[in-house]
Every structure is written in structure tokens, then in C-alpha cells.
Amino acid sequence: LMGGRADGYFIDESLLEAGYKNVTNRELLAAGSADQKVMHLASLYDGGKKGHLKYTLERSPDHEDQANLSELSIAALKFLKQRFPKGFFIVIEGARIDHAGHSNNIYNNIRETQSFHETVKKVQEWAEKQNAKTTLLVTADHETGGLELHGDSPKGVWPAHTWSTGWHTDQKVPVYAWGYASEKAEKIRHNTDVYHFFKNIVPPSSELAAKN
């Protein structure tokens, strides 16, 4: 929940001053998301300084208490549902896919994509149980690394591949939509279309505030 920065500024200090409760393990996450008295929740590692989740493939027993993206996402959904029962908007990012692209690491790139896929499944399962008009949109703001796979590979064998850069590319990215008004997502062609898609189906914030 929330991101980090690497310029020496410790985000958790300002968040605590603003009334946020910082949860850094599974136990605190469960307790914090269930506590009705907590109105602002964050999950930052290393004080918000390069506080990324460990890559899935690099997790060791030392990191077994660190929640994964699926757990953080479901906790955030439950937290918001409890406090805003009439509706809310949330952005969930599988940022480690991007990081693996920058480092041209095929192993982490594939595994983090799988982890994000697992998160999308969990979010969809949660949404299906809610009696609400829910829209789930899955896309990316860009591709990273210029990854290209070459030919077929046997099951269990990493594919032959090349990278063209360590930065973002202009490669097209997919858009998937599920739920309420999902058919309107077919018109999305540019990044800015995502904004207009939600603007047209989500009530203004003033209306949501009044409902909640």
C-alpha cells in the first residue's frame, strides 16, 4: 500500500504525523485493516526508502512475514469497503514487473507477472462476492525492457529471449476489463482514454462523499 522514494526522505515519518498507521508484516496488516478506529493505513518497508516488496523468487525465510501483493490488495479492498460502503476507487500496481524489466531479468519478470495475475484473480473473486457495480480494469502505463521471446520452449525451460533496452518503450500494452460497463473499455486506445473511461462511469467524488 503506497510507494517509496530513494532520496533520503523517510516517508513513514510524515505519514505517521498525518495519522497513518504503518503496518509492516502480515499480523499488523490484518489487525490494522480490521481496526475500525484506523482511518489511514500504509504498508512501507525500510522506512519508505527503497521500500519495495522482495521479488517473489528472492524471498527467503527472513521475508516469510512480509505480505505479498495479493494479500496487500485484499486487505486494502476490505479496508476501503468497511469505510466507504457506497463506493471507492483503488489503483493496484504490480511495480516489480517494471523493475525486472529495467534490470532485464527474465526470471523475475515472468514470476512477477504471474504474481500480478494471481492478484488479479484474487481481486476478481473478492469483487464477485460484493453486491455492487464493480469495474475491474487491468492494463499498464508502458512496457519496460523491450522484451522479445524467440520460438517455442519446452515446458519448464525458460524461453529464448532478447532485450532491446533497460528503459521504457513505446510497445503497445493490453487492456482487460471485467464487470460493470466493461464493454466501454473497447474504446480505449491511448493512456488518456483510461481517465475518460472512469470519468464516464464513476460518480463525481462529491457524490461519492455524500453517499459514504
Where are these regions (language model features)?
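A post-motif C-terminal structural segment
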Residues: 1-212
